[in-house]
From Swiss-Prot:
Main function: Formation of pseudouridine at positions 38, 39 and 40 in the anticodon stem and loop of transfer RNAs.
Ribonucleoprotein recorded as keyword: no
Swiss-Prot/TrEMBL catalytic activity: uridine(38/39/40) in tRNA = pseudouridine(38/39/40) in tRNA
Pfam families listed in its UniProt record: PseudoU_synth_1 (PF01416)
Subunit structure: Homodimer.
BP-aspect Gene Ontology terms: tRNA pseudouridine synthesis
Binding-site list for substrate: Y111
Keywords: Isomerase, tRNA processing
GO molecular function terms noted in the UniProt entry: RNA binding; tRNA pseudouridine(38-40) synthase activity
Catalytic residues (UniProt): D53 (nucleophile)
EC identifiers of the protein: 5.4.99.12
UniProt protein name: tRNA pseudouridine synthase A 2
NCBIfam families: hisT_truA (TIGR00071)
Length: 245
């Protein structure tokens, strides 16, 4: 059995997310599986590192699939890019060890979030950022971000779909940056609960708008109550930026 690692970019705007919903419908996983299955002549499943939600994008998603036959990497890449829709791109194909698993072997993930922070809308970025038309206090956001770095129980920053044995995750870095009309947030960690990144961003937006005190973050973490964060940042601004193994 041969195991192949795919590196994938996609514009998630028109898709229902990564995870196939029972058949090869309008999901990233479904589209790629359909083309791979046609290529190898049998139904083939791919395993993604991150099950991104509807509307979320990826700069470096990683997945793997297995094949009975040995495949030529550059031919696989060419075939997939020829038959996949043009908002999904395979940037690399590599044969890896048969025990490589895209989800379970990942050691760190990095997400980038883009906020368009001008009074006027940006028509070119409406599917690729969240528009906040009031000026954000980036200094306060940076102070709040410090409280989220480290190992914490992130129940308050998840939703009801997050039913993991442990809600503890470690955030390695959390940066807030300003650049040409945008406020960008980059977060790296060993793993993330469902909606955790979007709720972290939502909390930072609330802080930036003066709706939440930066010093309230430790109490929110401690309380473990999901209703403490009112803002769930829009999917459109979120990008899976990098995965480390």
């Amino acid at each position: 059995m041969h195991n192949y690692k795919l590196t994938i970019q996609y514009d998630g705007a028109r898709f229902k997310g990564w995870q196939r919903l029972g058949n090869n419908d309008n999901t990233i996983q479904g589209k790629i599986e359909s083309v791979i299955s046609e290529m190898v002549g049998k139904e083939t499943e791919i395993i993604g590192c991150s099950r991104t939600d509807a509307g979320v994008h990826a700069l470096n998603q990683v997945a793997n699939f297995q094949s009975d036959e040995k495949l030529v990497e550059h031919k696989v890449k060419k075939y997939l890019n020829q038959y996949l829709p043009n908002d999904i791109s395979i940037t690399n194909v590599e044969e890896v060890h048969d025990r490589f698993h895209a989800r379970y072997n990942s050691k760190a993930k990095t997400y980038l979030y883009k906020i368009w922070n001008e009074e006027h809308t940006n028509p070119f970025m409406r599917k690729y950022s969240m528009h906040v038309n009031k000026k954000l206090n980036v200094k306060s956001m940076k102070e709040a971000a410090k409280h989220l770095v480290g190992s914490h129980d992130f129940t308050a920053f998840s939703n009801a779909k997050s039913k993991k044995k442990s809600m503890v995750r470690e955030v390695y870095t959390l940066e807030v940056m300003e650049e040409a009309g945008f406020v960008q947030i980059r977060v790296s960690g060993n793993g993330f609960l469902h909606n955790m990144v979007r709720k972290i961003v939502g909390a930072l937006i609330e802080v930036g708008l003066g709706q939440l005190d930066a010093e309230a973050i430790p109490q929110i973490l401690e309380a473990k109550q999901r209703n403490q964060i009112n803002c769930l940042a829009e999917a459109s601004g979120l990008y899976l930026e990098n995965v480390e193994f």
